[in-house]
Amino acid sequence: MPHIQFLPPEPVVLVSRVADDPDPAGPGLHVAKVAVGDCTIVDARTPCAPLQGRFAVWTVALQLHSPDTPRSLTLRKRYSDFVRFRERLLLCLPPPLRRAVPPLPPPVPWYDAWRYSDVNLDRAWLAARRAGLERFLQQVLLNRALVAAAPVVVRGFLEPPAAHRWVPVRA
């Protein structure tokens, strides 16, 4: 039986906007640097779901501006997380700002869908996808106008999924 490695997301703490903060994006959303690093290949096949495949989880490193000290943040995201982020971003941005949102690297072509795992996990394919994801995040997260126009969507992308949030139980 293959070993499945669970990669829990690291906790994210974003600073809330205070009443006297003139920047609508808030102090916690000033990104200074974005880098998409290597990916981890996750094997999702189980005896109950043998047709599930393997997929890549990307490591995203962010350097945030902070009034006190610079903070860094490391995220782990699948390609589908980037797709959802871009879709939500385009839905909430005004038309003039939508043009500033670059396209994502393309998904596996339909004619290669029958060998999806082979194509999607090819080293050259992954290198091109990593470069495209990094370009996308740099053009979005380093653009203060985009972040200010959609802070809720940006925060949603930077926070771990609800299923991974720890909620204390009250006794």
From Swiss-Prot:
Keyword Plastid: no
Keyword Membrane belongs to the record: yes
Compartmental location: Endosome membrane; Vacuole membrane
Main location: membrane
Membrane topology: Peripheral membrane protein
CDD domains cross-referenced by the UniProt entry: PX_YPT35 (cd07280)
UniProt-recorded Gene Ontology molecular function terms: phosphatidylinositol-3-phosphate binding; protein-macromolecule adaptor activity
The PX domain, residue ranges: 1-164
InterPro entries listed in its UniProt record: PX_dom, PX_dom_sf, Ypt35_PX
Any one of the GO CC terms: endosome membrane
Cross-referenced SMART domains: PX
GO biological process, any: protein localization to endosome
Keywords for this protein: Endosome, Membrane, Vacuole
Source taxon at top rank: Eukaryota
Job description of the protein: Recruits the lipid transfer protein VPS13 to endosomal and vacuolar membranes.
Family: Belongs to the YPT35 family.
Record comment regarding domains: The PX domain binds phosphatidylinositol 3-phosphate (PtdIns(3)P) which is necessary for peripheral membrane localization.
Protein name: Endosomal/vacuolar adapter protein YPT35
Species per Swiss-Prot/TrEMBL record: Eremothecium gossypii (strain ATCC 10895 / CBS 109.51 / FGSC 9923 / NRRL Y-1056) (Yeast)
Organism taxonomic ancestry: Eukaryota, Fungi, Dikarya, Ascomycota, Saccharomycotina
